[in-house]
Structure formats: C-alpha cells, structure tokens
C-alpha cells in the first residue's frame, strides 16, 4: 500500500513538472523546438541582431505574417541564440512594448524607463518633449564611444497599433535614433498587417530601413505531424529520465496512431497555424492526471471536439422552449424575406400563427412575456439591432437580424433535450405556418 502511495506521489510530481513545461511552451512561445520552413528568415533576423549587439550597428526591421504564423517564436529563438553568445546577456538590453498595453507615448515612455531600470536616473526631471526624454534615457546607457555603448533591442508587438497613435511620436523617435550615430538600437516590429507601410507617416517611413521578413504557414502535413510530436515531447534535461522516456515514446506512438492522424488532418485542414495546434494540445493535456498519466487518442478527439465547438449553438442548448420558438419564428422569417431584417412584431405574429395552427394553450404566453424572451435573446447576442435604439422609438418595431444560420439552429435542436415534437416539426417545415 505504501509502495503504491509513494509511486503515485512520484507520478504526481512528474506530471506537475510536465504540465508546467508544456503549458509554458504552448502559452508563452518558449524557444524549445526547431523552426520549420523559416530558416532563411531566421538567418536574416539573427544576423541583423548580431550586427547591433556585437558591432554597435543600429537597425530596424518588421516581421509580418498572419496570427499564429510564428512571428514571436521566431524572434524568441533569435534572442535566445543571441543571449548565449559570450556575455551578451549582461551587455544587451531588451525593451518589450505592446500596442495593446502602451496606448500612448506617455505610457510607453514610463514602460521604457521601467524596463531599462532608469527610474532613479530620471527622478523628478522635467523634459520639454518626448524626443528629449527618450534621448536622455539612451544617453544614460552610454559608456563612451558608439562601439562600447550598451545596445538596446526594442521589440514592438502589435506594431500597427503604434501606427494609429497620435503623430506616431514613438515610432518616429525610435527610427530616428536608429538612423543617427547615437546609442546602438535595433527596432523590431511584429504585425499581421500586410499594408503596414501604408499606415506610416511620410516622416516615419523615411527613417525606416524598409527591411521586412514575411512569414507564412508554408509547411505541409508531414512537417505538421513532426511539429506535433516535437511540441509534445519532453526535453532531455527532464529530471525523471525514465518517465520522460515513457512520455516521449507515448508521443511517438500517438503520431503514428490512425485516429490521431485523422484528428490532426482535420485540424490541419481547418487551421494549420501553431497557435491552433497549441490550443488542441493544451486541451488534451488538461485530461492528463495521476490515474491517467499519458495522453491518449481519446483525449485528442475530445480536444478536437472542444476546439470545433460552435459557441452560439451551445448557447441555444440552454434556452427556454419559448425562446427556441422565437428563434424558429425568426428562421422562417429569414426564409420568407431572404435574410432581410425583421422586428419583434413580425416575430410575434409568426409565433401566433404556430399557436393558432396547433391550438396549444401551453405555448400561449402574454405578449410582455414574449417581449422579455426576445430581449433576452438580444442580450445573449443571438440577435442584433440594425440601428441604434432611440428613446422615442417603439421597441416592437426596431429592426433586428438573427445571428444564427439554419444549419446552426437545426444542429442545436437535435441536441436540445426535451424539445417538444411539434416545435421540432415546426422548425423542419420548409414554409411558415400560413
């Protein structure tokens, strides 16, 4: 009994480490795995960073590609390799900014000051402009001449959002410094906008080097399978070698399992970006426990089901019969008027036709009750108003549009427990009750 208990404790400890390592890999783009299909882009990026870090040469570059194409992973790989060269980790500074967080110049400047650990140097100094403040910060890092100054790598995530800020002051000053003989800096922007250069002001564009790296998900299914296996494998330095060997052997078996191959092929056909794969693996990893220590094909099938789940159709499963009836009435209105907007009164009239045809008093709700159910559907965002509601307009006559298509409605009704037969028949009828 005690042996089994100690074995469970060892398994629990190992699984805790597995969860930590893999979650970190899936969520934070940690540079563990090999890069696939981007060797040329990687070489270009690492050479540019080395020129800044080693030779004090300022540069600017944009990494452009759709979401999930591996922009952050590529950059993290390059930064990791750079920091492993000599004493680069001590001499090269990194400043990470995000367009979603640093929404104006003032916030960005505070974040730059914090990341460079220069709060004490700035103190209570008052600066006339953003450029003066930024120049002061970079001068504080200088040790003498250009080659011995401390290089700074600025990473601007969601770069296009910085382009929407007033006067593009941050971008202008960073690019301006990268063109002048001041502190050596590299400005690396990450964006999913292919038209990013069109967003830049003329003065900003003139100071940008126009270097761009484009990333596309160009790998095929065999490479996708290789990535799956590698992402799921534990590193060689994992403490428990025996457990790691078993885990990696299981990952290899999964990559050859016909059920898993079918799941991955379906996932690949829908969306082949790595974020989507990471989400699939994360959901499967959540099912791994002490009593179920290794991932199975069933876990991946369940994860695939959760990934492909229709959120709006899931909401329909929790609606009342009255709300279901209103959605069916709207479905018929869509069929009759060919997706044209409708109002509550039209939906109510359609619902009344159903009641009169069936002569069921059980569905005979008062109009205010039906109105309340209609408003609840609007709160759930299953229907949306076509125009802004005004104080004087009558609620019954405001135009709305249904945000569910016929397939979603019928699939949801199939899974709706205890749905009355006549309501189900009404939904499947091709014409409304006339």
From Swiss-Prot:
The keyword Kinase does not apply. ATP binds at residues 65-72. Signal peptide: none annotated. The modification N6-methyllysine is found at residue 7. GO terms for biological process: DNA replication; DNA replication initiation; polar body extrusion after meiotic divisions; protein polymerization. InterPro entries: AAA+_ATPase, ATPase_AAA_core, ORC4, ORC4_C, P-loop_NTPase. Its main location: nucleus. GO terms for molecular function: ATP binding; ATP hydrolysis activity; DNA replication origin binding; nucleotide binding. Gene3D superfamilies: P-loop containing nucleotide triphosphate hydrolases. Pfam families: AAA, ORC4_C. One of its GO terms (cellular component) is nuclear origin of replication recognition complex. Keywords: ATP-binding, DNA replication, DNA-binding, Methylation, Nucleotide-binding, Nucleus. PANTHER family: ORIGIN RECOGNITION COMPLEX SUBUNIT 4 (PTHR12087:SF0). Belongs to the ORC4 family. Component of ORC, a complex composed of at least 6 subunits: ORC1, ORC2, ORC3, ORC4, ORC5 and ORC6. ORC is regulated in a cell-cycle dependent manner. It is sequentially assembled at the exit from anaphase of mitosis and disassembled as cells enter S phase. Interacts with DBF4. Interacts with POLQ. Component of the origin recognition complex (ORC) that binds origins of replication. DNA-binding is ATP-dependent. The specific DNA sequences that define origins of replication have not been identified yet. ORC is required to assemble the pre-replication complex necessary to initiate DNA replication. Binds histone H3 and H4 trimethylation marks H3K9me3, H3K27me3 and H4K20me3. This is Origin recognition complex subunit 4.
């Amino acid at each position: 009994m005690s042996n089994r208990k100690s074995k469970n404790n060892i398994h629990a400890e190992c699984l805790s480490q597995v969860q930590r390592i893999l979650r970190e890999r899936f969520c934070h783009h940690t540079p563990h795995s090999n890069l696939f299909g981007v060797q040329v882009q990687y070489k270009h990026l690492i050479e540019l960073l080395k020129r800044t870090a080693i030779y004090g040469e300022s540069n600017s570059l944009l990494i452009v590609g759709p979401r999930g194409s591996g922009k952050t992973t590529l950059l993290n790989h390059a930064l990791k390799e750079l920091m492993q060269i000599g004493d680069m980790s001590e001499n090269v500074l990194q400043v990470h900014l995000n367009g979603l967080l640093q929404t104006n110049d003032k916030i960005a400047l505070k974040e730059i000051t914090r990341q460079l650990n220069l709060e004490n140097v700035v103190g209570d100094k008052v600066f006339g402009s953003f450029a003066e403040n930024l120049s002061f910060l970079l001068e504080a890092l200088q040790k003498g001449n250009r080659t011995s100054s401390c290089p700074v790598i600025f990473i601007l995530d969601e770069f296009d959002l910085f382009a929407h800020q007033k006067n593009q002051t941050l971008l202008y000053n960073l690019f301006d410094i990268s063109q002048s003989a001041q502190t050596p800096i590299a400005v690396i922007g990450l964006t999913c906008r292919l038209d990013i250069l069109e967003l830049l002001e003329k003065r900003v564009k003139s100071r940008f080097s126009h270097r761009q790296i484009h990333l596309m998900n160009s790998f095929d299914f065999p490479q996708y399978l290789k990535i799956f296996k590698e992402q799921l494998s534990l590193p060689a330095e994992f403490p428990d070698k025996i457990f790691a060997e078993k885990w990696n052997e299981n990952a290899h078996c999964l990559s050859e399992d016909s059920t898993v191959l079918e799941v991955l092929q379906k996932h690949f056909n829908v969306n082949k970006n790595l974020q989507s794969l990471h989400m699939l693996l994360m959901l499967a990893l959540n099912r791994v426990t002490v009593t179920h220590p290794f991932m199975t094909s069933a876990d991946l099938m369940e994860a695939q089901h959760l990934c492909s789940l229709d959120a709006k159709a899931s909401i329909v499963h929790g609606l009342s019969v009255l709300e279901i009836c209103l959605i069916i009435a709207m479905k018929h209105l869509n069929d009759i008027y060919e997706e044209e907007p409708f109002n509550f009164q039209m939906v109510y009239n359609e619902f009344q036709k159903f009641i009169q045809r069936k002569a069921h008093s059980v569905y005979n709700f008062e109009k205010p009750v039906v109105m309340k159910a209609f408003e609840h559907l609007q709160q759930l965002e299953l229907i949306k108003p076509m125009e802004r509601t005004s104080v004087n307009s009558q609620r019954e006559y405001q135009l709305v549009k249904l945000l569910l298509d016929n397939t979603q409605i019928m699939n949801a009704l199939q899974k709706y427990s205890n749905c009355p037969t006549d309501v189900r028949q009404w939904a499947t009828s091709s014409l409304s009750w006339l």
